[in-house]
Design a protein with these regions (language model features):
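N-terminal leader/targeting and pre-domain segments
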Residues: 1-396
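Pore-loop/selectivity-filter region of tetrameric P-loop cation channels
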Residues: 398-410, 433-499, 503
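C-terminal substrate/ligand-recognition segments
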Residues: 416, 420, 491-507, 512
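Membrane-water interface at transmembrane helix exits
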Residues: 424, 428, 432, 436, ...
């Protein structure tokens, strides 16, 4: 502690000591108050509620002197700066607010510094105006933080800040570059109808609950590189990462409360970037009715996505690089996508998803991701099938799906062709000798009589397989069918075999012609 002289009320000189534990500027001319844990503090920095009366006097004295340096100050009780005008730079860095603090409609004309400030109970900055830089780096909000309707006219920094309760930025205006780099949102983060006039970064930010950007306007690029949308519970491991080439059934069956990442009706006038972003299994991201003036600047790089997240928008011009869509070949994947979308859209979910799959297929096709395009086309047609009865043998499209996966599934078409061959071969094998005409020798040199008698025989299993293959190849293998049953089987295989072979050829052609 340093010592200065100050006049006492009776004119005598008394010893006044300045607090050196915190910044000198904030406690200049403040007398020594008390000791705490062996350290000496002035009335501003003493960390105890019993100083309230003296603190109020010191606070009023600083404000009346237009002294807004409160670096490291410990505020013991509720405080209101509502509609207060800070004509000079307001320095609240490292300050501690024990009770609710109210900055509603306050005006910060020369900058606001809240670096490493701690708000223990609640912070109200509704409709506050920041004309110069606003710095909340590493600030900690233990209770609700309300910035609804606030206006940030210059650079704004919330980098590495911690919001342990709801963070409300509804309708907030960010007119210059804004940084939420590494910011932690452990409760709902609400940016509904916020306006970002300059680039905004949420790189490495962590969203544990809802991230809502409904109706937000982005006039410049917004970045979400390596952001995490997941519950930070250390006992939960529910990431979907771009390193995963497949997503198991548990991934597509969320447990617990869904984590919404909501860009509904948002407007992106420049770009959007999700790079290396991690999403929890329970995340549901929606861009429904969002508008992109430069859709080619919407970039999703090395991250994991779900097709139903892009329902009700047009993603054909988006840039998808090294994106993991999950196992689109998994049985029931389409049905799970429909169920996920129906959790938020009760009506026309099937129609929206069908359109989305077709648009994603176009995007993949135009960017030479042909295997991915094949999967999306298949899923688009399968959505329409699932709207009807599951088994519908009277509809041609149902057979098209069953026998070749709409001409997109080579293994299925091959398996169907093989099944036709084997099933007809088994039918020929179980048939008795009366099914077949006797073989007649045409080797005239070997004939010793003018008439020779032959006996019909059943086909062995190997002979049946060869016979079935010959019929399928439109040959006329011997023995020829002798009764109606055998002739009917041969006729049906003559039709079905070549048709299925054509479906297989079509699927192969679609796979390689691109």
């Amino acid at each position: 502690m340093s010592t200065v002289s100050s006049p006492a009320p009776d004119g005598a000189r008394v010893s006044v000591r300045k607090c050196e534990h915190w910044a000198h500027g904030a406690c200049c001319a403040e007398i020594f108050d008390k000791e705490h844990d062996g350290k000496q503090y002035c009335v501003l920095h003493y960390p105890g509620p019993e100083k309230s009366k003296d603190f109020k006097t010191a606070l009023e004295r600083k404000l009346s002197a237009q002294d807004f340096d409160f670096e490291g100050t410990w505020f013991p009780e509720k405080l209101s700066f509502q509609e207060f005008k800070f004509t000079g730079k307001a320095n609240f860095s490292s300050a501690r607010f024990r009770e609710v603090v109210n900055f509603r409609e306050a005006e910060f004309s020369a900058g606001a510094d809240f670096r490493e400030a701690k708000f223990s109970t609640g912070a109200d900055f509704r409709e506050a105006k920041f004309s110069a830089d606003a710095d909340f780096r590493e600030a900690k909000f233990s209770a609700g933080a309300n910035f609804a309707g606030a206006q940030f006219g210059s650079a704004t920094y919330f980098a590495m800040a911690h919001f342990d309760a709801n963070a409300n930025f509804r309708g907030t205006q960010f007119r210059a570059a804004t940084s939420f780099f590494g910011t932690s949102f452990r409760a709902d983060a609400v940016f509904n109808y916020a306006q970002f006039e300059a680039p905004a970064t949420f790189n490495v930010a962590r969203f544990s609950k809802s991230a809502l950007f409904t109706g937000a306007v982005f006039n410049a690029t917004v970045y979400f590189r390596k952001a995490r949308f997941k519950d930070e519970d250390p006992h939960r491991n529910d990431d979907i990462t771009a390193d995963n080439n497949t997503i198991d059934s548990k991934t597509l069956r969320p447990e617990g409360r869904t984590i919404p990442v909501d860009f509904v009706e948002a407007r992106f006038k420049d770009g959007l970037a999700f790079t290396g972003t991690k999403f929890a299994n329970r995340v549901f991201m929606s861009f429904a009715s969002a508008s992109f003036e430069k859709p080619e600047r919407a970039v999703f790089h090395s991250t994991s996505l779900r097709p139903h997240w892009f329902a009700d928008i047009d993603p054909r011009a988006f840039s998808f690089i090294n994106v993991a869509w999950g196992d689109l070949l998994q049985w029931g994947a389409v049905r799970k996508e429909i169920e996920q979308l129906k959790t938020t859209k009760k009506s026309n979910a099937n129609q929206l998803l069908e359109i989305t799959f077709r648009q994603l297929a176009v995007n993949a096709e135009e960017n030479n991701r042909f295997e991915e395009a094949t999967n999306f086309r298949y899923m688009a047609m399968d959505v329409k099938r699932l709207q009807r009865r599951r088994i519908d043998p009277f509809r041609l499209s149902w057979w098209y799906w069953l026998l070749s996966g709409y001409g997109e599934r080579v293994p299925r078409a091959f398996l169907a062709l093989l099944s036709i061959l084997v099933l007809f071969a088994l039918a020929y094998w179980v048939g008795d000798a009366a099914w077949w005409q006797p073989k007649q020798s045409r080797d005239l040199a070997s004939a010793t009589t003018s008439e020779q008698k032959f006996v019909s025989q059943r086909l062995a299993l190997r002979e049946s397989l060869v016979y079935s293959a010959g019929v399928m190849a439109l040959q006329k293998p011997e023995p020829l069918p002798a009764n109606k049953r055998a002739k009917t089987l041969v006729l049906w295989e003559t039709i079905l075999g070549p048709v299925q072979a054509a479906l297989l050829a079509l699927a192969i052609r679609r796979k390689f012609m691109r």
